[in-house]
Amino acid sequence: MASSSSSSYRFQSGSYPLSSSPSLGNFVERIKDACHFLVSAVLGTIISAILTFFFALVGTLLGALTGALIGQETESGFIRGAAIGAISGAVFSIEVFESSLDLWKSDESGFGCFLYLIDVIVSLLSGRLVRERIGPAMLSAVQSQMGAVDTAFDDHTSLFDTGGSKGLTGDLVEKIPKMTITGNNNTDASENTDSCSVCLQDFQLGETVRSLPHCHHMFHLPCIDNWLLRHGSCPMCRRDI
């Protein structure tokens, strides 16, 4: 009788691990799945942050360089141009990255998204995307600055006028030589197409421009005429007219 009870006890006690094994296994699998999901989410966040930083850094550097070069040739100035370019380049690069990420997560084909992302990266590194964004931003800054100078010039000396000369009269402005853009005078020494440093637009064949005396810098008539009515110097080299 005792032997029977002992056997029954051993059987019952041995049955508990058998009944609890499936529950324990499911619990372990859930823990593994949760850990796998957590690790994937963390890695995805880290990779996204690294790529965002990369795009922002490249955009900032290229934007600052492009903005500085444009600002040096306009009224924005080297430092202000670099600052505007850096901010615009960083913001635009992050926008491009986020758009690429949204496209990657969409229902579009993975291969097409991959080619698009490669094209974006190449265009970003070459500076094309940043230049396309910086140009309008710098033009807006130049126009805003010229408008501000126009309203304050009667009471204050322009911060950008190092020559100290006042604006010319309308009659004097009209006496400054005009010329028509042709294939012979539309390029600089580096064979690049000349452009107006006020509005940043390239000169087109057949356009009438004004060539300043002494320095011979050329500008669109509306751009330079408005400038000369407020300043008596070249907006590029500051040489007095």
Curated annotation (Swiss-Prot):
User: Stromal compartment: which residues?
Assistant: 58-76, 131-241
- Molecular function terms, GO-annotated: zinc ion binding
**Topological type in the membrane:** Multi-pass membrane protein
In its UniProt entry, the species of origin is given as Arabidopsis thaliana
| Any single Gene Ontology cellular-component annotation | chloroplast thylakoid membrane
This chain belongs to which protein, by name? NEP1-interacting protein 2
- Where is the major localization of this protein? plastid
Write out the annotated subcellular location.
Plastid, Chloroplast thylakoid membrane
What the entry lists under SUPFAM superfamilies is as follows:
RING/U-box
